[in-house]
Structures are given as structure tokens and as C-alpha cells.
Amino acid sequence: MSDTARISGGSFTSPPGRDVELNSFKEASQTRLYPYSSRKEEEGREDEQQRPEREEDTGALTGYKLVLVTVGLCFCIFCTSLDNTIVATAVPRITQQFHSLDDVGWYASAYLLTTCAVTLPFGRLYTFFPIKWVYLSALFVFELGSFICGITPSSLGLILGRAVAGLGGGGLFSGSLLIITQCVPLRRRPAFSGFIMSIFAVASVIAPLMGGAFTDHISWRWCFYINLPFGLVSAVVIFFTFQTTKPVVQASLREKAAGLDPLGTATFLPAIVCLLLATQWGGAQYPWGDGRIIALFTLFGVLLACFVGLQLWARERATLPPRLLRGRNIWGSALYGFCLNGAMFTFVYYLPIWFQAVQGTSATESGIRNLPLVISNVIFAIISGVLVSATGYFGPFMLLSAAMASIAAGLLSMLHPSSGAGEWIGYQVLLGSSIGMGFQLPVFVVQTTLASTDIPTATALMTFIQLLGGAIFVSVAQNVFRNQLAADIRAALPMLDPKAVINAGPTSLRAMYSGETLTTLVAMYNDAVVHTFYLAIGLAAASFLAATVIQWRPSPKSISHPDSS
């Protein structure tokens, strides 16, 4: 046969050896773009997805540079986490100034919607472009949104600013964890990541307290101005201290564009927006049977089906390569984080309501009474990170965390109007310890069991899942709370308008009612809050079941590094 391809009957036959050449070229191209992933695409087993046992930590920092980067990342996480809940106590003053009561729901949801929607696509940006510049770009967008919120003269401007801030915030949480992977050797990574992630929980708890203090003593605009100096410090530290590294995946511009999965992103973003709008509006702003809610859920289902189909078709170039979800450690960790975060945010939102409505504290005092939850969370996040670093195991700590969270949720559901400090302090310490121990572990799993090329996408996935769990179940808890309180009022106090009582808020209860009516309403508030805690019990128990699928296998600890002893 000649060296020239022959055409016979409309068929093309390659010369000898050409098929081998073409196949080798295709394999080499895919390996260049996805050097770890392509070899394992059809396997999906955890033990085959584990990163090499020895991997150079060439970008690791030590001394004051490591301290500066850690502080800078903490500032970023603190600011983005504050924005989740800080606006809650400022809403009454904002609506009074802008005469915008109908826009109240958008002040919180605009930030949440864009944050959740862009978190997963940011994983691809971190894969194909230098982490430093993607991170600083996200920080700039977040700061721009905060600046718009601070100076806006209108309600529409505030909503726009919140949405812009969310676009940047969606890339900062996962980006902070990725910078840690670049700066800290693997054996020390859990301790650093645990401390940084504990800042998220701390900021989420104290944000309403800070928002109330700014609103009462300075201006509600400082709820957003506060982000500017913190963000500036973070930007300066990251710019001068964190060295620019090559992208995780080396590829041409065309390959990068394909790897960003524009079609998948175009279906994923509106799908998440539809889901979150439906869960936030349903039962609160509109009845669940309202055409708008049904349409949103329908659109979500259609868009999600399109997204899944596109991911299966795109495979390695997908926003979320299907291969990543085949390993039980990955999908088990995702389910664990989804449920545990949902339980945590249920308590973050409704424990202050219990203090204010049932025990008659002010918003500021309720924040102070949440300190046992905050302090225990931080302490056990650090302890958990150190123990995981020392033992190399994360499975046992995930089980212990979920078991403790289930017990703590059950104990908190036993609170009543006459509960003493010993009860609510002790129960919060147990809850904070359990959440602190397990909150960061899903990220540890992906960062210690996957190849380096998969870490940005998998880290973004875990961040997205945790944010989504909090967003969805806070909305579910809100509906449980409102429906239970309204039902109790209609049954025992038919002369009162349930909507008026709910809209008045927990801090106005004692100013509006007295005597037997107040006593009855306090008991009803207690009952409604406890029903949200029942939801948290179920979520904590579900996280325990998810933790049972995680393999008890030591993660790599011995990483070669010039600074290692």
C-alpha cells in the first residue's frame, strides 16, 4: 500500500501507522490540557483519582509572608460573609429612607443570587488563568459593588450594588482556599484552611450585630463602606506577597475558551437564579401555588436538565466534569456539606429571633448571647484542622461532627421561655464545636484526594454546594416559621392578624402587646422557632448518613518541600 490514503466506495482508509499517529496526537492533546483527568475519565474511582503521593509545594510561603497572606484572606472572607446577613438589621432604616418596602426581599437576595450563580463558573476561571489575577479581579468587583451600595441615592441602586458585589464575592471564598493550596504544604493545609473557613461562620453570626450598631450609631451605609478598607488591605497584601503562579492547566486561548464551557454556564446561571427566587418567594411573598412560583420551578427543572446534558456531552471541558462526581468521597462530601451548612444557617438565623422574641433581648444583646456559638466554632475549626493534619484522616471527624450536630440540634429544640443561661450556652457550645469540626472538611477531601488540575473546580463545587444549602434551607426554615406562627395565632388568638404580628418583628413584640396576650405570643414564637430547629435536626442527621460513605483512608501528608524537615 502506498503512503497515500486510499478512497474506496466513499470510505477513507488511513495508511498504516496513521491511525496510531492520530490517536497518539489526540491523547497527547488531551493530556496536555488535562494531564491528570484524561487518564481516568472512565474510571471515577477515588483511589485512582488521588493525587501523587509526593507533590512539590514550590509556591509555599513561610514566616511573615505566610502570616500576611493568611490575614489578607481572612479579611476577604470576613467581608464577603458579612454581606450575607449584615443587611438584615439595617433594612428598617433603609426602607424608611428610600420608601421602598416592596424591595425589602431584594436587598438580601440580590447578593445571594449572584454569589451562588457564579461560584461554580469561577472554578473554571481558576483552572485556566493565574489564581492571583482572577482573585484580585473578583475582589475589585466585590469592592465596586460595596461602593455602589454605600453611595447609592436610590433603592434600585442598592439592589444593583448588591448584585455586583455578589458577582465578585462568588469567586473570593473558593479563591481564598485555592491560594492556601499554593502557599501552604499539604500536611499543614487543613489547619490553615480550617481557621480561614471559621471566619465565614463567625462573620455570618456577628453580621446582624454589626449591622445594627452601624445603623443605630453611624449610618446604614457603613454596612457596605466597611468592606472598602478591609478589601484594600487584602488586595495590597495579595498583590505584593502572593507570587503569580502559572495556571493549573496550560492551554491555548482557544482551548481555554472551550474549557470555560460557555453553553453550560449559560444554562447553569439562570437555573440557580430560578431555584433561589422560587425558594425565597414561595410561601412568603407569593403562595406556593402561585403561577410565578410554579413557572420558576419549571424553568429550573428544564434548565437543570439542559445543564446536565451539556455536562455529559462536554465531559472534560464541562463546567463540572461528570467524572468528578463518580467517586463516593466527592458526592458524599458534597451532600454532607449541603446538609450541615443548611443546619448551621438555620440556627444562625433563628437563634437570635428566639433570644429577641422569647427572652426579650435587644438585637445587640442577642448577638452577644450568640458568642458561645462563635467562639466554640473557631476553636474547634482550628483543632479539627490540626487533628486532620496530624492523622491524615477526615472520615472519622466528619462522622463525629455530624453526630454532635444532631445531638446539639435536638437539645436546642428543647428550649422554652424559661430556659436558663446554662442551657442555651451549653447547647450553643456543643453546636459550635460540631459545626466548627466539620464545616471545612468537604474542602479538605477534594484538596487531598484529587489531582491538582481538578482542585479549582472541585473546591468551587464544594463552596457552591455549601452556599446553596444555606440559601435553600434558610428559605425553607422561614416558611416553616411563618406558617407555624400564623397557624398558632389563628388557633389561639383569632382577634389578631398573623401577618401584622409577623411583620412587626420579634423586637416589637413587647411594645405592642402585654399581659396574657404577650405571654401567649411568646409561647407561640418559641414553638415556631423550635419547629425550624426540627428541620435542622433532620439536616444534621442527613449529614451523618452522608458522612458514612466517606472512605476512612489517610490523605497524603508527606509532601516534599525545601522548607520541610
Curated annotation (Swiss-Prot):
Q: Which family does it belong to?
A: Belongs to the major facilitator superfamily. TCR/Tet family.
Region: Disordered; residue ranges are 1-57
The name on file for this protein is Efflux pump aunC
Q: What does this protein do?
A: Efflux pump; part of the gene cluster that mediates the biosynthesis of aurasperone B, a dimeric gamma-naphthopyrone.
Phosphoprotein in keyword set: no
Q: Where in the cell is it found?
A: Cell membrane
Q: How does it sit in the membrane?
A: Multi-pass membrane protein
Any transmembrane segments, and where?
59-79, 103-123, 128-148, 164-184, 194-214, 222-242, 257-277, 293-313, 335-355, 378-398, 399-419, 425-445, 457-477, 530-550
Q: Which UniProt keywords apply?
A: Cell membrane, Membrane, Transmembrane, Transmembrane helix, Transport
Gene Ontology molecular functions: transmembrane transporter activity
Top-level taxon of origin: Eukaryota
Residue ranges with Basic and acidic residues bias: 38-54
Known SUPFAM superfamilies for this protein? Answer: MFS general substrate transporter (SSF103473)
Where does the UniProt entry say this protein principally localizes? Answer: membrane
Q: Name one GO cellular component term.
A: plasma membrane
Report the InterPro entries cross-referenced here: MFS, MFS_dom, MFS_trans_sf, Sugar_transporter_CS
Report whether Transmembrane helix shows up as a keyword of the record: yes
The Polar residues compositionally biased stretches are 1-14
